Swiss-Prot record:
It comes from Aspergillus fumigatus (strain ATCC MYA-4609 / CBS 101355 / FGSC A1100 / Af293) (Neosartorya fumigata). ABC-type transporter; part of the gene cluster that mediates the biosynthesis of the isoquinoline alkaloids fumisoquin A, fumisoquin B and fumisoquin C; as well as small amounts of fumipyrrole as a shunt metabolite. The products of the cluster lead to a brown coloration and are important for growth and conidiation. FsqE possibly plays a role of self-protection. This is ABC-type transporter fsqE. Keywords: ATP-binding, Glycoprotein, Membrane, Nucleotide-binding, Repeat, Transmembrane, Transmembrane helix, Transport. Belongs to the ABC transporter superfamily. ABCB family. Multidrug resistance exporter (TC 3.A.1.201) subfamily. InterPro entries: AAA+_ATPase, ABC1_TM_dom, ABC1_TM_sf, ABC_transporter-like_ATP-bd, ABC_transporter-like_CS, P-loop_NTPase, Type_1_exporter. One of its GO terms (cellular component) is membrane. Its main location: membrane. Glycans are attached at N467, N1037, N1138. It is a multi-pass membrane protein. Residues 380-622, 1043-1281 form the ABC transporter domain. ATP binds at residues 413-420, 1078-1085. GO terms for molecular function: ABC-type transporter activity; ATP binding; ATP hydrolysis activity; ATPase-coupled transmembrane transporter activity.
């Protein structure tokens, strides 16, 4: 999975050969790939190989036992003929029949034993090999350099681990076992045929060669197109996961239909490639089913000639022909298993390519120097940097600077100037294209990467915490040393680090203290709490170098003060490099470096640079807050603020930490809510019939195609009873005495001709089955994916607040669950229907010919069916457990990939892999018992058929001895019913498919049945029915836009014990700007969420021009609103796509787009790119800096020309210069619209018409900037804390 090149290659004239080589190896890995393992079996251990060898031998022996049937059958025919000729007495007939019937019993016992051992062994080793492959793949991913991830499709890793690995595991377990058994049956049958009479076997052998060649060539063609289809399905999975991860912005912009169309477009491309593969498979299956009829025709025709010449006996002709029959049906069974195996091979090839890629920045290798001491002196010497994924832009140009040991160095500058890139170079996330980065005089490229990162601690603007306890998260900072400490020592060290980070007090106040789970992404904690836990995590390793990248920019003033105090303490006695936009945080730095467009423009201390009145002084001036000189803060103003650090939710309940005493209560409430909304997908139990009915309803549009395919399936099933009539008739004919040989030859020619005709009809029937039903199945899978994706995208935010509805889990439903449901689609249903028609027709035929023997044989079929049904139930339970484990492991792997920079920075690769292996091993231990039971039932369903044969022959011989039945009657009953019994057993080879489909249908039905209370049911579906008459009143367009919160109270569904807003009443007049300020957790962003109708108030109303917003059409309402949030979302695609994303379906000229870019202060950057607006931004905007992404989001909002503008920390990621320009543009466009701002940086709100100070969801203060300063209250304290002096 080497990332593709996404941007144009740099002009060769700009780069020398060395620079091109540096970029190339970061994109494509080092030359001379590691020794690549050829297939999944290379991941088997010695014990696995022993078990696999024994299992393979048992599978071969099980397959080889089947052709012994013709031998026993030939002996019985000889006895029957002898009785008819008078050479065998009735008592002798009964005795020999009983003996030969016992042979069938012995055959059944042997087949059961061998099948059981083979099945258990393959399931056991297959699970272990797939587990090893999963682990190795994830290890290979975690080894890769950052450029690899910059171009990696969103959701691709999760899709590989969840869906593709499941296909591989299935291929090397049940499918491989079935295929080996079938191959052994075919080979043994071929040998038996040669032993019986080699000439006849030699005559028909070309047909076997044709069948093998057909499978080989057809399989290669199928793999090629199936591989392309899998690549496209992986791409579609990436689109889905990216959309679900950004669901709030998707909802706000109303782009559900746009993303659904993009998703569907890729699915259609995948379906085209898949259809080519399926058409070839259809031809192969039809040919394999038709070919045996030609073999019958030729075998009987040739056999009759040798019989009349006296070179063969009747027993040899019948035994040879029956052996050929068994061998041909074995080849038919090979095809579907080979298809699954080849699919697994194709997928494994892509996985092995990723595993074989050699990373130029591998954290797990032992190479590189490890100096015994570190001083911490960092020097960049004439460093140039070009990102491999954006090789047309110089990020750093000839930068030389020094970060002195044990000193605090700050780097400031405009957005995109290269500040964070310097930190990336120090961490060795990227390689410089020129110059060197030195640590204590050593080139860091010569140092061991893992050792280097252990000396460094990084604290980001948005710190990543993992879904674990606070204790575990802090210990992740020194994961390599934890094993050396006792539990008490671990806790002591964590407490010490927490005290240094100013985090111990709030952690101790929690009910579970350091053992409190922080939730996914740490969202159970506030922003300030997360930041302080991240600082503690950084300090526990006692790093020599501390990197702080906008560590306080996302915090309110009070949280910033507490975190800044912790950072100041952390910076003591170590080299510290700070990247910051808020200059108040770096005034005390020992050295300040100012960057502009990748170059150093100024250096010095804060006071020296201010005195120069240059670029730095201009930045300082822009961050001053007016009028504070008239209202000085008293001494200790910072300390006067209460330690209330709970953070407001970012459009969701997950980010707001509740009162600590209520945590357990809320967890129970969450579980209950999840159950009530139907999100507990495993709680719904669907039977196989319900699953089939569900699939039928989904396939209603294609009923004509389905009807055609299923009709052909019934006709195809009837060909086997017809074969039994032909077979029994010919066996009777070839028993004629020598005087009747001319008649024998004539009738054999006639029946052989009928076999040839049956070949053509069988081929046509099976082609109709496979082509029609595979087409319908593809349509089913595409429709399910589309409907589920649309359903997910229109759900209310409360749905996504439920922990089980993570992007990875929902993406899994769209990929693996859809595939599993399709596994019980057309071809499988057609196969089952074919087998049922064969069984029923066989029973009817046998009853018509010889009802006594037919009733006895038919009575045994339910036993076979019961064994298969029990196996299905066991597999259903087993698959449920495996599925849950797969979701858990895939979700964890997805979390690691999404947070790979944090994983790399902390050196967590080995720890993460160990935990991942633990998740997989835990499930493997649980599944062993189910494997043992399921294998026993499967072996029983495969071997009981020979007990049926024993009974049939014994009772048939008794009827012949008593002259009640002729040999023809016994032959036709035996062939039709024993074949029917075998086919009844074959139905349950589809048990794994049915089991997976049953579980998948539960998940998919839950998704489809979800009914959002706010959003429309589906973008293209009918609008939801409204209750009452009030909601049916005419819609009004947003015009004057007077916004009023009328006594609004609200509690997040996922946080039912605490009110986010409490009786809030605020009015914003048309055209006014309202600023919402306050501490984290005060309810500011909740107001934005309610205005966007992500949620509806519990009490009160929100009015627009006097009308409740709940009475408006939600899509029309949101079109007149633009949201710019701190959490900037950039979608994969071009800059143009991202700016126009909120105007889906509307014609927008480039001039309009460029004007919006100019307003957002990003025009110069866009025009500097070779591809301009057509430049690809990478996954999640990975090609852009944080400020550039924010300005694109602002340009997007400007272009929508909204009537209501919502700004939630819209400029928090911008440098002072960009912020001033963008703020000026915002001030200009606010004149014609109502604006509601949420801000921590108070310099951005001082010109607002109304400023509301919120606390604990209530309105604390209201007024203008000057009025609130005059009150010397809460707002005055906040302003005083942010002023620069």
């Amino acid at each position: 999975m080497t990332p593709p090149q996404m941007v144009s290659q740099l002009d060769d004239a700009r780069l020398d050969e060395r620079q091109r080589a540096i970029l190339d190896r970061q994109l494509h890995g080092l030359g001379g790939e590691t020794k690549q393992r050829k297939n999944v079996f290379a991941y088997a251990t010695v014990s696995d190989r022993i078990v696999l060898s024994v299992s393979s031998i048992c599978a071969v022996l099980a397959g080889a036992l089947n052709p012994l049937v013709p031998v026993i059958y030939g002996l019985l025919v000889s006895v029957y003929d002898g009785f008819a000729a008078g050479t065998v007495s009735a008592s002798e007939l009964r005795s020999k029949t009983a003996t030969f019937s016992l042979y069938y019993v012995y055959l059944s016992i042997g087949l059961f034993a061998f099948t059981y051992v083979a099945t258990v062994g393959f399931y056991y080793t297959g699970e272990r090999m797939a587990r090893a492959l999963r682990t190795t793949y994830l290890a290979a991913i975690l080894r890769q350099n950052m450029a690899f991830f910059d171009l990696l499709g969103p959701g691709e890793i999760t899709s590989r681990i969840m869906s593709d690995m499941g296909t591989v595991q299935e291929a090397v377990t049940s499918k491989l076992a079935v295929m080996l058994t079938a191959i052994a049956t075919f080979c043994a049958a071929f040998v038996v045929a040669f032993i019986m009479y080699w000439k006849t076997a030699l005559i028909i052998s070309p047909f076997f060669v044709i069948m093998i060649v057909t499978e080989t060539l057809g399989g290669a063609y199928m793999v090629r197109h199936h591989k392309r289809a899998m690549e496209l399905y992986s791409q579609a999975a990436g689109i889905a996961e990216e959309a679900i991860a950004a669901i709030k912005h998707v909802t706000a912009f109303g782009i559900q239909t746009l993303l659904s169309q993009r998703y569907l477009s890729v699915l259609e491309q995948a379906a085209k490639a898949d259809r080519k593969a399926e058409n070839m498979v259809a031809g192969m299956i039809a040919w394999m089913n038709a070919m045996p009829n030609l073999i019958y025709a030729l075998a009987f025709w040739a056999g009759s000639i040798y019989l009349t010449r006296g070179q063969m006996s009747v027993a040899e002709v019948s035994a040879t022909t029956l052996a050929v029959t068994i061998g041909s049906f074995a080849i038919i069974r090979i095809a579907p298993s080979a298809q699954a195996l080849l699919s697994g091979i194709a997928i494994t090839g892509e996985i092995l390519k990723s595993i074989a890629r050699r990373s130029p920045q591998d954290p797990l290798v032992k190479e590189g120097d490890e100096p015994s001491t570190v001083v911490g002196d960092i020097v960049l010497d004439r460093v140039g940097l070009i990102y491999p994924s954006r090789d047309d832009v110089d990020i750093l140009q000839d930068v030389s600077l020094r970060c002195a040991a044990m000193k605090k160095t700050a780097i400031v500058g405009s957005s995109g100037s290269g500040k964070s890139s310097i930190l990336g170079l120090v961490e060795r996330f990227y390689e410089p294209t020129s110059g060197t980065v030195l640590l204590d005089g050593r080139d860091i490229q010569s140092l061991n990467l893992r050792w280097l990162r252990r000396q460094i601690a990084l604290v980001d603007q948005m710190p990543v915490l993992f879904n674990a306890t606070i204790l575990e998260n802090i210990l992740y900072g020194c994961s390599d040393m934890v094993s050396q400490w006792s539990e008490s020592e671990q806790l002591d060290r964590v407490v010490q680090a927490s005290k240094k980070a100013n985090a111990h007090d709030f952690i101790s106040a929690l009910p579970d203290g350091y053992h409190t789970h922080v939730g996914e992404k740490g969202l159970q904690l506030s922003g300030g709490q997360r930041q302080r836990v991240a600082i503690a995590r950084a300090l526990i390793r006692d790093p020599k170098i501390l990197l702080l990248d906008e560590a306080t920019s996302a915090l309110d003033s009070k949280s910033e003060a507490m975190v800044q105090e912790a950072l100041d303490a952390a910076a003591e006695h170590r080299t510290t490099i700070i990247v910051a936009h808020r200059l108040s945080t770096i005034q005390n730095a020992d050295h300040i470096i100012v960057l502009d467009h990748g170059k150093v423009v100024e250096e010095g201390t804060h006071h020296a640079l201010v005195a120069q009145n240059g670029a730095y002084a201009a930045l300082v001036q822009k961050q001053q807050i007016g009028d504070t000189h008239d209202h000085k803060a008293p001494d200790g103003a910072r300390l006067s603020i209460e330690d209330d650090d709970d953070e407001d939710s970012r459009y969701g309940g997950n980010t707001e930490y509740v009162d600590e005493k209520d945590i357990r209560t809320e967890e129970v409430a969450l579980s209950s809510a999840a159950h009530d909304e139907g999100t507990q997908r495993d709680s719904l139990k669907l039977s196989a019939l319900q699953t089939i009915a569900f699939i039928a309803r989904l396939s209603k549009r294609d009923w004509k195609v389905l009807l055609f395919g299923l009709a052909n399936a019934i006709l195809a099933g009837l060909t086997i009873p017809v074969q039994s009539v032909f077979f029994a008739k010919i066996l009777t004919v070839i028993g004629f005495p020598p005087p009747q040989y001319p008649q024998l030859r004539s009738e054999v020619d006639f029946w052989s001709g009928l076999y040839v005709m049956l070949t053509g009809t069988t081929f046509l029937f099976w082609m109709g089955v496979e082509i029609a039903l595979s087409y319908a199945t593809q349509k089913l899978a595409r429709r399910v994916r589309e409907v589920c994706f649309r359903s997910i995208l229109v759900q209310d935010m409360a749905f996504f607040d439920v922990p089980g509805n993570s992007p990875s889990a929902l993406s899994s439903v769209l990929s693996k669950s859809t595939n599993d449901l399709a596994g019980l689609g057309g071809p499988v249903m057609g196969g089952i229907l074919t087998f049922l028609s064969t069984i029923l027709a066989g029973i009817v035929l046998a009853l018509a010919i010889g009802w006594k023997l037919a009733l006895v044989c038919t009575a045994t079929i339910p036993i076979v069916v019961a064994c298969g049904w029990l196996r299905l139930q066991v597999l259903s339970t087993f698959d449920s457990k495996v599925r849950q484990s797969g979701i858990e492991s895939a979700a964890y792997a997805g979390e690691l990939v999404r947070t790979v920079r944090t994983v790399a920075s902390l050196g967590l690769e080995e720890h993460a892999l160990a935990r991942y292996e633990g998740i997989l091993a835990k499930q493997a231990a649980k599944s062993l018992r189910s494997i043992l039971l399921a294998s026993a039932l499967y072996a029983a369903s495969a071997s009981v058929v020979y007990l049926c044969a024993a009974l049939a022959f014994w009772y048939g011989g008794t009827l012949i001895a008593s002259h009640e039945y002729s040999t023809f009657q016994v032959y036709i009953c035996f062939v039709s019913l024993i074949s029917g019994s075998q086919i009844a057993g074959s139905i349950f080879t589809y048990a794994p498919d049915a089991s997976k489909a049953m579980h998948a249908s539960r998940e998919i039905q839950d998704i489809m049945n979800l009914k959002p209370s706010i959003n429309k049911v589906a973008p293209t579906g009918p609008p939801p029915a409204h209750e009452g008459t009030e909601k049916n009143q005419p819609q009004q367009n947003l015009s004057a836009c007077r916004v009023e919160f009328e006594h609004v109270s609200f509690t997040y569904p996922s946080r039912p014990t605490r009110r986010a807003l409490d009786n809030l009443h605020i009015t914003v007049e048309p055209g006014q700007t309202l600023a919402l300020v306050g501490q984290s957790g005060s309810g500011k962003s909740t107001c934005v969420s309610l205005l966007e109708r992500f949620y509806d108030p519990d009490q009160g109303r929100i009015l627009i021009d006097g009308q409740d917003i709940k009475l408006r059409d939600v899509d029309e309402y949101r079109r007149d609103i633009s949201l710019v949030s701190q959490e900037t979302i950039i979608f994969s695609g071009t800059i143009r796509d991202n700016i126009t994303v909120g105007l889906a379906g509307q014609e927008v000229s480039d001039d309009e787009i460029l004007e919006a870019c100019k307003q957002a202060n990003i025009l110069e950057f866009v025009q500097s790119l070779p591809d301009g607006l057509s430049t690809l931004v990478g996954t999640g905007g990975s090609m852009l800096s944080g400020g550039q992404k924010q300005r694109i989001a602002i340009a997007r909002a400007f272009l929508r020309k909204p009537k209501i503008l919502l700004l939630d920390e819209a400029t928090s990621a911008l440098d002072s210069q960009s912020e001033a320009i963008v703020q000026e543009a915002m001030d200009a466009i606010r004149k014609d619209r109502t604006t509601i701002m949420v801000a921590h940086r108070l310099s951005t709100v001082q010109n607002a018409d109304v400023i509301c100070v919120l606390q604990d969801g209530k309105l604390l203060e209201i007024g203008t900037h000057e009025q609130l300063l005059g009150k010397r209250g809460k707002y005055w304290e906040m302003v005083s804390m942010q002023s620069l002096h």
